[in-house]
Amino acid sequence: MSKVAVVTRTHNRPLFLARVLKTVAEQTFSDYVHLIVNDAGSPDAVRAAVAQLPAAAQSRVEVINNEVSHGREAAVNPGFSRAGEMGVTYVAVLDDDDSWEADFLTDCVAWLDSKPDYVGVASRTTLVYEEINREGSAVVELRRGPLAPDKHTVALEDILQVNWVPPVSLLFRAETLPKLTGWREDLPVLSDWDFFLRMLLLGPVGFIDSPLANWHHRANAVGDDGNSVVVAAQDHNDFHAIIRDQALREALTCTASPSTQPDLKTLAQPLLLAHYAKALREENERLTQQLKELQLQQRERNEEIVRYFDEKTQRLSAQLGEVGESVLLLHERMNSMGFKARWRRLFHRG
């Protein structure tokens, strides 16, 4: 029995599938099973990608073929079900277009082994911006940087506002799956946020402040090659509101089915408060930015006024200097022509 199940959903993305198979095969932790959920894609393409791995890595891969796709979010659940059947201790969701550093599983497993009261642990995530070359034969990295560099702990308060812990960064206990019942299949996006919110109701999630997870983004990719956070950006905005609305409706009407499982109705008020807190913070940031721009404009205007009067003063000083020189010159010329003596004689007669 493997200790960790890594669930990867894929659909006709052989370029990414080859990369994710490689990143898992290169983990320094080897007590895992890699569950590939082929969501109604080409089985031959998946087999070909797996065949490129060393024999030891191939033996740790199991492919689950969905004949019919029930949606991107639903594709995770067959992997969860299989992980439960296998009796693993920990589970991770690693999408086919993301990657890990070699010590991700080693460090996360060690952390959870030492913290039995925690339901999961997340590592710091690196945002990797990339594009597919024109030939479609390679992925080219453009730049990278840390995701949420100001965060150093996983707090429900923060996740209520926005999920800065993507699936690629999270390892959680398999024993939570019966209570969480997987990702919601009625949502086209944000099932990971909904799942993570409900997980945080079960217990705390730790944080490893080392960049062990890589979340890959392709701003210009479309179709199968795109990221949902990019190609379905409007859906993310819409369903963020829909999830909050559902939680509030369940809380107000008590329509949620009674059970011991965590559900969103318990988060209705916190979700709304977090949403408005986020809106207020963004408005404050907008107003602060406007104030900075106004202050900059005023400073530039003041500098223009100072420059204007400096130039005027310099011109006046120059003109006065010219007048002074003219007066001196006139005085010298008058002296040279005897005007001073004549003036004295004229004044003396008077």
Identify the residue ranges that each predicted region occupies.
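C-terminal subregions of glycosyltransferases and related glycan-biosynthesis enzymes
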Residues: I159-L160, L201, H216-K340, G350
